[in-house]
Amino acid sequence: MRWWLAGLVLVAVLAGVIYFTRPRSAATSQEAPQQASLSSAGYVDPAICASCHADVWETYRRTGMGRSFSQPVLSNTIGDNKSAPTFYHKPSESYFTMLERDGRFYQRRYQIGFDGKETNIMEKEIDFVVGSGNHVRAYLHRTSRNKLVELPLARYAEKGGSWAMNPGYDHQDHPGFSRTITYGCMFCHNGFPEVPAGSGEAGADTVFPGRLPEGIDCQRCHGPGGKHAQAAESGAKPGEIRKAIVNPSRLSPERQMEVCMQCHLETTSSRLPNSIVRYGRSPFSYRPGEPLGDFMLQFDHAPGSASPGGSYDDKFEIAGAAYRLRRSECFQKSGGALLCTTCHNPHDIPRGGEAARHYNGVCSQCHDAAVKQLAASGKHPQSTDCIGCHMPKRRTDDVVHAVMTDHYIQRRKPERDLLAPLAESHVTEDNGYRGEVVLYYPQDLPNGSDRELYLAVAQVNQKSNLSAGITALTAAIDKYRPGPMQFYLELADALRDNGQMTKALPIYEDAVRREPNSLPALRKLGVALRSSGQPSRAIEILKRALDLAPADGATWHELGLNYVDQGSKPEAIAAFQKATELDEDPEVYNSLGAVLLESADLARAEPAFREAIRIRPAYAEAHSNLGNVLSASGRFEEARYHFEAALRLNPNYAAARQNYALALARVNRFEEAQRQVEAELKSDPGNAVAHDLLGNLLVARGQVKPAASQYQEAIKLRPEFGRAHLDLGALLADSGDVAGALPHLQKAAASPEPGVREEALQTLGLLGKAR
């Protein structure tokens, strides 16, 4: 009897269960509806301004704001040499270069693959350049669906010009060619663009279908210029012409500052959130002269909070000039006299020696007498480089290759080297700030619904203060019953993130009842239903979402995952293929490959996994899945390459280690396979699957008693583990202990896994015949 049972156990070792992990649903996106018109809001082509304000127009065009966004040309991409050096990024083992072909510009990435040749090649055309070059230039690509994505390599002004990765990219698994430019990004880096109607909804897709402005224009600080231009062209009186436009210098000090603070008050660029645009406001609806708090609310870390580098109180980030200025005693005690425009003429920036004289002259208006007195007593240098000592240049915490003037006016210059190189901190959901989020601006927001609701949302929006935020947001919603659906969606998301899906699900349902045509709400409800084991209902909801937005790749992906859960593989494959046609999303390709792998369609699974890796080379799941395909196809050495890549990327990836062990067993490297499984059990002794696999490997090496112990441990950890019952039953029967084998084989025969159930029934049948 031993011959066939031993063969059964060996099949379990060599074939095994193919493990793979399907990813979470992709980020939200939305079909672009009809565009809203800037002209209807009173905006005009900013070039009209030049007809009356030619001098200001010419000087402003040379400022950083005037050059903030542009078309690619030789000078702002690869330089006059028509070539750029290849940049090697060690953490991701990737090579990047900038290319020019026939007057068009591209950014290219490649890696060195298993065969020593270039692999994972990605090349995208540069459609736009963001940044003036005073500090940094980044490069954007516009997709066929009018999304803007940031390309990984940037050009920094430091060291006379140098190439380095964009902020947030200096680590192994960076965003690659997939970082989407949001409306929040565009708000501060360019003039207002045309955007789809309904763009203010949380989770709405960020698409830019029209012609984009080239640089921050006059109307960002002066408001829509249509009425002003019309009045001037019609010969209206000077007073009427002036009244038709916002002149920031005629606003109150508070409103004047807010014109600048709409973009220069960023409390932090790391996960917090730093600001929330009020629900119901579209992303480009702020108008100079209105209270900034009517458009957005600004938030900050709680005072005294510890940061990885010390304290968040002293954070110095690239878009926080006004944030730092507001800390200064000079500002706080000026009574509104010290504004951004006290030092800065936004229309014309002084340069070189003229700049030093200008800024020092501004300081002298208040401090001249005191400085002379201190200099006479030997307590102050005779020279008056005010800025160099009291507002020194400093390397920014968030863009570590950029050096900026610190607008915190200090009595004494810090003693440390402010320009010393900094390593980029890699902030994730797992290691980000965990603490209270406080309202920063406007500080005088009165108690009531706005304060309570938005402050509660700030706690949960990026998981900074999840438990307390859930309590506060629940109470605020119960108290005020707000109209905007987004409050309910935020609460549902927070409950989901806190592992309370049972409580989240009815709130997602409520959000959809409030806005039945909200694509983000429908998709999130679909995800929640799937997580709650209701794929049929989820499919119904997701089909409603696709009726609204048939070209939404994320919804097609989620639909496919529900079909997988239902066991409807052909429908799942069709949904995933549709999603791949719409978005270049590695998770979609991995999901497609996974269901093809489950269907034993290795020929089609392999290119799907390779495409997932090409898009995201540091995708551990896709490497492991490709390793499974290659191992099953008899290409062990290449399979080993991908399994080891998966484990380098994620050393704690249990499924990859187990799959690697199975691949080693397929080529009779049982000792190596055993070491892999033992390493997994060392880090996770409670992994029942690993104990079962180790038992199979021990059987293959003739170590029957230790194998039985491993099967027993697997069953102890998971009493209903059908595969372990099958393996132990087969081993006992093979050893002649049929009585001991029968209970385990009978348990396996009742397994919900069809393969385990069929093997157990077959074995029981053979045992019956043998007896």
Q: Could you describe each region identified by the protein language model?
A:
Residues N465-A472, D497-D510, S531-R544, D565-K578, ...:
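Structural signature of tandem alpha-helical TPR/SEL1-like repeats
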Residues L445-K479, E490-D493, D497, L561:
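Alpha-helical segment of the N-proximal tetratricopeptide repeat
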Residues G448, G483-P484, S518, D552, ...:
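Residue-level recognition of tetratricopeptide repeat
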Residues W4-T21:
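Hydrophobic alpha-helical membrane-insertion segments, chiefly the h-region
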Residues A700, D734, G740-R771:
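Terminal, low-structured helical/coil segments at or just beyond the last alpha-helical repeat
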Residues K479-Y480, R514, L548, E581-L582, ...:
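Structural marker of alpha-solenoid helical repeat scaffolds
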Residues Q30-E31, A36, D55-S132, A138, ...:
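Primarily the internal scaffold of c-type cytochrome electron-transfer domains
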Residues L489-D493, P520-R530, A554-V564, E587-L597, ...:
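Conserved alpha-helical positions within TPR/SEL1-like repeat arrays
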